[in-house]
Amino acid sequence: MVKNSIIPVISQEKKEKNPGSVEFQIFKFTDRIRRLTSHFELHRKDYLSQRGLRKILGKRQRLLSYLSKKDRIRYKKLINQFDIRESQIR
């Protein structure tokens, strides 16, 4: 996933790039999560990075739950766009 390719998709409705938006923050966390998981294929015992990954996953989950409460349509669109599994715990 390339940063430049996704920014226009996120800011398409607002006609401006807003790095503080919930969608952009979720994109950044998702990008970091995917990079870290590919890192773990080579470095299985990198426990410090695994802890960082768990922290990032928690932050992304909190943002996703916030977005699902505020705007369910944007939440569903974002989940489908980034191929994120929907949380079962509410």
From Swiss-Prot:
It is found in: Plastid, Chloroplast. It comes from Glycine max (Soybean). The gene is rps15. It comes from the Eukaryota. Belongs to the universal ribosomal protein uS15 family. GO terms for biological process: translation. SMART domains: Ribosomal_S15. GO terms for cellular component: chloroplast; ribonucleoprotein complex; ribosome. InterPro entries: Ribosomal_uS15, Ribosomal_uS15_bac-type, uS15_NS1_RNA-bd_sf. One of its GO terms (molecular function) is structural constituent of ribosome. Keywords: Chloroplast, Plastid, Ribonucleoprotein, Ribosomal protein. HAMAP family: Ribosomal_uS15_B. This is Small ribosomal subunit protein uS15c. Part of the 30S ribosomal subunit.
